[in-house]
Amino acid sequence: MGRKDAATIKLPVDQYRKQIGKQDYKKTKPILRATKLKAEAKKTAIGIKEVGLVLAAILALLLAFYAFFYLRLTTDDDPDLDQDED
């Protein structure tokens, strides 16, 4: 019976450590929250690489269309010039 009573009573050192742990957690909680928000913002933010890749893809498509129409028009003009000269 004496052992049960002794187990429920905590040592003052353990109580002190628990109290310090609670205070430390309360202090670091806003810091942890701010760090978590920074990491989340970094993950969801559009980076320069993604923007550059999108712009490069659009530029490549525009150049492809331009080259297609340029080559299409120049091949049509060449036979007409040859026929007029003869």
From Swiss-Prot:
Belongs to the TRIQK family. The chain crosses the membrane at residues 51-71. It is found in: Endoplasmic reticulum membrane. The lineage of its organism: Eukaryota, Metazoa, Chordata, Craniata, Vertebrata. Pfam families: TRIQK. This is Triple QxxK/R motif-containing protein. Keywords: Endoplasmic reticulum, Membrane, Transmembrane, Transmembrane helix. InterPro entries: TRIQK. One of its GO terms (cellular component) is endoplasmic reticulum membrane. It is a single-pass membrane protein. May play a role in cell growth and maintenance of cell morphology.
